[in-house]
């Protein structure tokens, strides 16, 4: 099973970047590409402590990913493979491409909150 990142369904597309995602065989696959710095933290409001409760495994293709935890911060750069523990808030640097994998069962409740917040945000921008 495989596909091009361009063929993944879009969650978000805007001039500052895109976020594509699908679910295969119990795994969630995400591809993100951002031309500008992006802080998706506001999309996490409604989750405990406004932090993502799902673990992720990822690879930074280019750019930088900053992950903030309650007690520390981790920075991943191009070429880094990473494990992101639950209880985090991500931020993406300009010109960043990132691929992440998550257990779909753990990610679904997070995406329910994120989807509601994204829809509300998009309505205020209209």
List each language-model region with its residue ranges.
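Ligand-binding loop in jelly-roll beta-barrel domains
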Residues: 27, 86-111
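General beta-strand recognition
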Residues: 66, 75, 97-99
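Short, charged/polar surface micro-motifs in flexible loops or helix N-caps
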Residues: 35-41, 62-65, 106
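A short, N-terminal "cap"/entry segment at the start of jelly-roll beta-barrel domains
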Residues: 1-41, 48, 115, 120-126
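A short, polar/proline- and glycine-enriched secondary-structure boundary/capping micro-motif
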Residues: 41-43, 77-79, 109-113
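Short acidic-glycine-tyrosine-enriched beta hairpin
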Residues: 69-88
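Short, conserved beta-strand element in jelly-roll/cupin
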Residues: 50-67
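Short strand-coil-strand connectors
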Residues: 25, 68-72, 93-95
